[in-house]
Amino acid sequence: MACSLQKLFAVEEEFEDEDFLSAVEDAENRFTGSLPVNAGRLRPVSSRPQETVQAQSSRLLLLHPTAPSEALGLPDLDLCLPASSTPSADSRPSCIGAAPLRPVSTSSSWIGNQRRVTVTEVLRETARPQSSALHPLLTFESQQQQVGGFEGPEQDEFDKVLASMELEEPGMELECGVSSEAIPILPAQQREGSVLAKKARVVDLSGSCQKGPVPAIHKAGIMSAQDESLDPVIQCRTPRPPLRPGAVGHLPVPTALTVPTQQLHWEVCPQRSPVQALQPLQAARGTIQSSPQNRFPCQPFQSPSSWLSGKAHLPRPRTPNSSCSTPSRTSSGLFPRIPLQPQAPVSSIGSPVGTPKGPQGALQTPIVTNHLVQLVTAASRTPQQPTHPSTRAKTRRFPGPAGILPHQQSGRSLEDIMVSAPQTPTHGALAKFQTEIVASSQASVEEDFGRGPWLTMKSTLGLDERDPSCFLCTYSIVMVLRKQAALKQLPRNKVPNMAVMIKSLTRSTMDASVVFKDPTGEMQGTVHRLLLETCQNELKPGSVLLLKQIGVFSPSLRNHYLNVTPNNLVHIYSPDSGDGSFLKPSQPFPKDSGSFQHDVAAKPEEGFRTAQNLEAEASPEEELPEADDLDGLLSELPEDFFCGTSS
């Protein structure tokens, strides 16, 4: 039988349930004889070293149902949770005493001799008559170091209370029983190098445990084998304690109170690999509470790390839907799992808030997903800053969409832009004046003010532009714009005396738009229509106007215009005439013109005499060649008519 089982467990791949059950039945038929044949059951025993102080150790046993459960015809598989031995006063062969429930785990470091129990010896001891309800058991005992002496009666009893765990599907229940007595441990044997004995195991699940004893209100139910069959119910505060036997699958536990167990996953590992036992699952605050029939005291659960230290540890809680798993990777690789099907409902286990996570879970290779690949790829890439937004940010002069507008092609700023000339009539009658503007604007400043009418005006009046007291300096175009725009120093917005040259003249239906200039700058203005009619031939580009009391019109802070009327005009120096043409004697110069009055008095008498002679010789009947009948009629009108109209 041992050889057949070794061959069965020696395979490194997963085998079917029928193969395992057939081997077990064959073994039972050989060794049991007249005993009734039933499905073989595994009794994995913990391989964790026990405390030296404690005299007895509990095992993870696979028990058979009692007589009442057999009457129902339900064979079951009982998983006895290993627990520390109770005091000698409480342990009795006939009745089962209270025993503390301890999570059994396998230490990663193995010391001392390793023990192995053969199937023949186990069957020989389990075949002793104890009760008519007991069945033969198959016990596979894991490797263990014997720290303290183990004592126990020869007769096999139920080791301890069955601590059951509910499974997810209906009819699935995990029975866990704890007995106060343990079977004697067989002598240790050396490992065989060529043959690897496969042993059923349940991997330790206690990854991180919390210290502290379990409250006494939670106790395990006790089940008597000889006298009566109690219904122990292990109640926990949380509904789902899942088991995770390896990476191949997990066993979630639903919230049902008592359901029969249908499937239990076992993992078979080689003899050289560490064997781990089933550990009761509970959270930091969740404990096990016994049924009303149970009156035995309960000791707190202890984690494998605290067995030698004597301190209790509880697993860390997790989410209720999470499943506890046993790692499937050891030094030998993956282990095949054998599903068994016990069917005896005895008790149920409710899990605390969550279940602990196995300590070996962190050693598993992380699952590579598309999201993980994208994160790694994005982290490895060097960030590239966009060039287009940065370029736009540099060109934006102020917030808003208008800040992206390009600069003007001419390079002129808003401060330099002045009010444009009035629009030209659409009929195009004044196109010839536009031609004059282009022709006159081509002359340079030196040619305009170094000779011609401007030089004639200065020589006639004896003016010097470099004299600070001269009106050519104090009331130049630049000074007028500065005083008017910035300083507001012009009295009644009028300039006392001023001399300007016509740069361009654009006639309209009413007035004419003129651009005046002098050596300091340019300025826009208007010429009254009466003055245009009177001095039509003299008012042309290049003529120099001598003005007095000129009004300055300022529609805005940046735009200023000179308004030239017949009352403001003193003399016109035409580019065609040498000395220039003066006004008629009926329009005398004002006496309060300041320096301009002294300049006019200093002029030679020949100039006035020449002007008077020209007027005396001219008669109303004598007309100039260019004059027509309309000009003759206008010349016959009295002067008061023009003065009244202009005013």
Curated annotation (Swiss-Prot):
Q: Where is this region: Disordered?
A: 284-361, 380-399, 581-631
Residues annotated as carrying Asymmetric dimethylarginine in the record are 285, 295, 329, 337
A molecular function annotated in GO for this UniProt entry is:
single-stranded DNA binding
| Keywords from the UniProt entry | Chromosome, Disease variant, DNA damage, DNA recombination, DNA repair, DNA synthesis, DNA-binding, Methylation, Nucleus, Phosphoprotein
> Which residue windows does the record flag with biased composition (Low complexity)?
319-332
Please spell out the taxonomic lineage of the organism that makes this protein: Eukaryota, Metazoa, Chordata, Craniata, Vertebrata
Keyword DNA-binding part of the UniProt annotation: yes
Its recorded name reads Homologous recombination OB-fold protein
Q: Which disease is it linked to?
A: Ovarian dysgenesis 11: An autosomal recessive form of ovarian dysgenesis, a disorder characterized by lack of spontaneous pubertal development, primary amenorrhea, uterine hypoplasia, and hypergonadotropic hypogonadism as a result of streak gonads.
Task: Give GO terms for biological process.
Answer: DNA damage response; DNA synthesis involved in DNA repair; female gamete generation; interstrand cross-link repair; male gamete generation; recombinational repair
Please name the source species: Homo sapiens
State where composition is biased (Acidic residues): 618-631
What subcellular compartments does it reside in?
Nucleus; Chromosome
Give the quaternary structure: Interacts with MCM8; this interaction is necessary for MCM8-MCM9 helicase complex recruitment to DNA damage sites. Interacts with RPA1; this interaction associates HROB with the RPA complex.
Where are stretches of biased composition, namely Polar residues? 287-308, 380-390
Major subcellular location class:
nucleus
Q: Name one Pfam family in it.
A: HROB
Spell out the InterPro entries in the cross-references: HROB
Primary role = DNA-binding protein involved in homologous recombination that acts by recruiting the MCM8-MCM9 helicase complex to sites of DNA damage to promote DNA repair synthesis.
